[in-house]
C-alpha cells in the first residue's frame, strides 16, 4: 500500500480539493493558531456540537433555522460584528478563552473563520476528517 502526503498551507489551495474525489482519503486539518484549538476547547467545556461553515451568510441561515445555536467566528482575526451581518452580532469570536463552560455547555455552535472552517469544509467529502 502506497501512502501520499499532501500539505496545503493556504486557503487559496482549498479550491482544487473540492474538485477531487476524497471518498477514500483521510484529511487531517491543523489550524493551530485558532479554529481547531477553539473547537477542541468548546467541546472540552461541554458544547454539544460544532457546525463549521465557510461563509457568514451560511452561519446566519443556520441561526434562522435553529434559533438556539450560538454564532461564533472571525474575519481576519476580528470577531464578526453586526455591521458585517446586517444587524446580527455573533455571540463569540474565535479565541479559546471565549468558549468557557458557562457560555457553551449544552450548546450547538455554528462557526465560520477566515481559514480553519474553510479547510474543514474543503475536506468534507473525505472518508475521515
Give the role of each language-model region:
Residues 1-61, 67:
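N-terminal glycine-/serine-/threonine-rich phosphate-binding loop
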Amino acid at each position: 500500500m502506497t501512502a501520499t502526503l499532501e500539505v496545503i498551507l493556504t486557503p487559496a489551495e482549498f479550491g482544487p480539493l473540492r474538485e477531487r474525489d476524497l471518498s477514500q482519503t483521510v484529511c487531517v486539518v491543523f489550524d493551530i493558531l485558532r479554529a481547531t484549538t477553539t473547537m477542541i476547547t468548546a467541546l472540552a467545556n461541554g458544547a454539544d456540537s460544532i457546525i463549521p461553515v465557510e461563509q457568514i451568510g451560511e452561519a446566519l441561515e443556520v441561526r434562522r433555522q435553529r434559533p438556539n445555536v450560538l454564532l461564533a467566528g472571525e474575519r481576519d482575526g476580528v470577531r464578526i460584528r453586526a455591521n458585517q451581518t446586517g444587524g446580527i452580532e455573533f455571540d463569540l469570536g474565535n479565541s479559546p478563552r471565549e468558549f468557557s463552560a458557562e457560555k457553551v455547555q449544552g450548546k450547538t455552535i455554528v462557526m465560520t473563520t477566515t481559514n480553519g472552517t474553510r479547510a474543514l469544509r474543503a475536506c468534507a467529502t473525505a472518508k475521515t476528517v
